[in-house]
Amino acid sequence: MASAKEISQYLKRFSQLDAKRFAVVKVGGAVLRDDLDALTSSLSFLQEVGLTPIVLHGAGPQLDAELSAAGIEKHTINGLRVTSPEALAIVRKVFQASNLKLVEALQQNGARATSITGGVFEAEYLDRDIYGLVGEVKAVNLAPIEASLQAGSIPVITSLGETPSGQILNVNADFAANELVQELQPYKIIFLTGTGGLLDADGKLIDSINLSTEFDHLMQQPWINGGMRVKIEQIKDLLDRLPLESSVSITRPSDLAKELFTHKGSGTLVRRGERVLRATSWDELDLPRLKSLIESSFGRTLVPDYFDTTTLLRAYVSENYRAAVILTDEGQFGAGRLTYLDKFAVLDDAQGEGLGRAVWNVMREETPQLFWRSRHNNQVNIFYYAESDGCIKQEKWKVFWYGLENFEQIQHCVAHCATRQPTLLG
């Protein structure tokens, strides 16, 4: 799945969190129905490695089937299910059955899990005249969840709410998840779906979204349909009220471990992210912080005169100096000038966030052609292969490029890389 170092890095990061701040996992009813084995396997694995997720589930398809069997027509207003007293009795039964089905499956898989079908969401009627017995969450009681976590057991929660007087109300599972997340402020919010993530215009998985740099552009795309638009806006609203380090992952149950424990992931990772600063002079940057970023990223020391002897063309740096791209101008060749990628640095604790890609994407929008070199054992080479038009192997380096127009340009760039002096010691 990944290197032991990668897995260890993420496990250490997650293990340092307060138990209830690790992850909230939102499971749709379709996943419970169609992918229960993969779901229980993934959740059990997390418990085996010492992590306890908080699981909240829906039961939409199951509820549709039971209401239809009872002759109760489905009626929604503004996307919310109108709930009559007759329907509520079925809602309670279906939610409890779905909850117990997941808890029992986890227990049969060797995991410890606790059924929590009430007592978490205090609610009031959303609008009784319009929606019937539908609730709006007013408060979240963490006591049942904390008791489960302290016992080392996975809390499995339904989205049923209760009024202060004890009336059960049907609460939309997405709304309930949002309120739970606001109360817990978790590091990870995970939506498990059958599609395994958000898809672009070509049906290809979007692996990461950095909202600070990509949200406005994304919302302008014609292929962002109504449902996806609402989902992305909801995620942005959610993350805007959480700590900067919090993130949303959308993935399949079977890919949960890969999404959590590898840099590459397997799904769509959405973060509020950081703005990307653009500079054309070293004077515009905090050079001690930039030096620390580069040296930490490469595990080596910059030559002492790097900033004095390197003529900067453009630098792209995340606002907290956790990722950076440094470009230099290598002069005229043919009809245009050549741009060289001198450094691409990402801190260890930012790997897997999509922050490096976000900085790279901002750079690429303004840089139609580029060449660079990388050591043979550089783990980033997989990314470079995907981003380049070609690669030539030298004795010490791999030379990559994109946007170069002809063989003479490529030949010139390869020769330049062979003779360029290293700027990192050790």
From Swiss-Prot:
Substrate binds at residues 59-60, 81, 170. GO terms for biological process: L-arginine biosynthetic process. Its main location: cytoplasm. The record marks 26, 231 as: Transition state stabilizer. Pfam families: AA_kinase, NAT. Keywords: Amino-acid biosynthesis, Arginine biosynthesis, ATP-binding, Cytoplasm, Kinase, Nucleotide-binding, Transferase. It is found in: Cytoplasm. Residues 274-425 form the N-acetyltransferase domain. GO terms for cellular component: cytoplasm. It catalyses: N-acetyl-L-glutamate + ATP = N-acetyl-L-glutamyl 5-phosphate + ADP. Pathway: Amino-acid biosynthesis; L-arginine biosynthesis; N(2)-acetyl-L-ornithine from L-glutamate: step 2/4. Residues 253-426 are annotated as: Unknown. One of its GO terms (molecular function) is ATP binding. InterPro entries: AceGlu_kinase-like_sf (IPR036393), AcgluKinase_fam (IPR004662), Acyl_CoA_acyltransferase (IPR016181), ArgB_GNAT (IPR011242), Asp/Glu/Uridylate_kinase (IPR001048), NAGK-fArgBP (IPR041734), Vertebrate-like_GNAT_dom (IPR006855). In the N-terminal section; belongs to the acetylglutamate kinase family. ArgB subfamily. This is Acetylglutamate kinase. The lineage of its organism: Bacteria, Pseudomonadati, Pseudomonadota, Gammaproteobacteria, Lysobacterales.
